[in-house]
Design a protein with these regions (language model features):
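Positively charged n-region of N-terminal signal peptides that target proteins for export
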Residues: 1-10
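C-terminal motif of bacterial Sec signal peptides marking the signal peptidase cleavage site
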Residues: 16-20
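N-proximal helix/coil linker or "cap" segments that precede and/or mark the start of modular domains
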Residues: 22-53, 70-72, 116-117, 123-124
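A short beta-strand-turn-helix
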Residues: 53-76, 100
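Short active-site neighborhood of thiol/selenol oxidoreductases, capturing the structured segment around
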Residues: 65-89, 108-109
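Structural microenvironment flanking redox-active thiols in thiol-disulfide oxidoreductases
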Residues: 89-129, 140-145
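Short, internal strand/loop/helix patches
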Residues: 123-162, 170
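Thiol-/selenol-based redox modules, centered on thioredoxin-like
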Residues: 158-197
């Protein structure tokens, strides 16, 4: 009986590790909001609030607003991850490959929740994976609300050209990232009257 209990506990621990990492396990707090007031509103039944108003710092040190980030994009995929999260690191190569296949009206952006504290490590992880897209390392406004409501990383949300959620988010690493992302991006594009991928 004792061996069965131990085996069951080990299996449960492995399952939790593969599914995602608790955000609180290694994340430091996101700085308080500045600039525009966060809306904190959900556009519909989706998991998290919209991210319509925020200022962010990118990995290269430049500043960007929500309006700048979403400009000209019908769909933005935002993958929130951490340098201390094994499932996040495991999916990074697949994220990098997927990002390179996207058309001009769709973008994949990453947000490293501990990137402001571990900038060099974040940059090295992305470089090793070959990720060439945009990476945020800190953000305020609506992004603060999003991060406060997230319980696990990786968490991926899908938003339209103004930061409204367009479909269900993904919590954890899907077994087939490209398929899961494509399904959600297609749904978002079709809802906007556009052709899918």
């Amino acid at each position: 009986m004792k061996h069965k209990t131990i085996a069951l506990l080990l299996a449960l621990c492995l399952l939790l590790t593969l599914a995602g990492c608790s955000k609180d396990a290694g994340q430091t707090a996101v700085p308080a909001a500045s600039g525009e007031e966060p809306s904190g509103q959900k556009s519909s039944e989706y998991d998290f609030p919209d991210v319509r108003f925020f200022d962010a710092t990118l990995l290269d040190g430049s500043a960007v607003t929500a309006e700048d980030l979403f400009d000209g994009k019908d769909v933005t995929v935002i993958n929130c991850w951490a340098t201390w999260c094994p499932p996040c690191l495991d999916e990074m190569d697949e994220l990098a490959d997927f990002e390179k296949t996207l058309p001009d009206n769709v973008q994949l952006v990453t947000y490293c929740v501990d990137g402001a504290q571990h900038t060099d490590e974040c940059a090295q992880i992305l470089e090793d994976a070959g990720f060439e897209g945009t990476t945020m390392i800190s953000a305020t406004g609506d992004f603060t609300t999003l991060i406060e409501q997230m319980q696990y990383v990786p968490t991926t949300i899908f938003v339209d050209g103004v930061g409204r959620q367009t479909c269900d988010s993904l919590i954890g690493s899907p077994s087939d990232l490209a398929e899961a992302y494509t399904e959600r991006i297609d749904a978002a594009l079709k809802a906007a009257g556009k052709s899918g991928l």
